[in-house]
Amino acid sequence: MNNNLQGDAIAAAIDVLNEERVIAYPTEAVFGVGCDPDSETAVMRLLELKQRPVDKGLILIAANYEQLKPYIDDTMLTDAQRETIFSRWPGPVTFVFPAPATTPRWLTGRFDSLAVRVTDHPLVVALCQAYGKPLVSTSANLSGLPPCRTVDEVRAQFGAAFPVVPGETGGRLNPSEIRDALTGELFRQG
């Protein structure tokens, strides 16, 4: 996609996000659906769309670590833990951090933690940079169906009018690995 078309697609996506709606976009392995993490209305729309219970918690995806800092508590990280995390970011590894009390429950669910990732997908980096904050991100698929890997699959599952940022996935076969930021415990193999 040329830069003008990409810029137009990102601007259109930001308009949708500002309306507290959900968008779809390519990530490292599959298409994701996401929304404004600070909008309870938007997050509830996403959860309803996915038929996902609020208590499961969600993942935030960001252009850089600074975008994630308001949502996580990194004060307990050792230098070695920071080094491990930053050696894997940007990239397809999600880390679960302690969450401060100010992080909304619609993001953390029943947990006192939040899963976050600094993406290396260029389109998502550009989207988060233009939006100025991270996005809630979960796989683009309806309950019981496989995750979408193309724009056409997104439209087939969510409808022709669903707002999609066009682009290619990063080509990975598996969703992101998920690890505990403090202990390194593996929650999901990538």
Swiss-Prot record:
**E.C. number(s) listed in UniProt:** 2.7.7.87
Keyword ATP-binding present in the record's keywords: the answer is yes
Q: What class of enzyme is it?
A: transferase
Q: Which UniProt keywords apply?
A: ATP-binding, Cytoplasm, Nucleotide-binding, Nucleotidyltransferase, Transferase, tRNA processing
Catalyses which reaction(s):
L-threonine + hydrogencarbonate + ATP = L-threonylcarbamoyladenylate + diphosphate + H2O
Asked whether the UniProt record includes Disulfide bond among its keywords, one would answer: no
Q: Which family does it belong to?
A: Belongs to the SUA5 family. TsaC subfamily.
Q: Which HAMAP family match?
A: TsaC
Protein name as catalogued = Threonylcarbamoyl-AMP synthase
Source species of the chain: Escherichia coli O1:K1 / APEC
Q: What broad taxonomic lineage does this protein's source fall under? A: Bacteria, Pseudomonadati, Pseudomonadota, Gammaproteobacteria, Enterobacterales
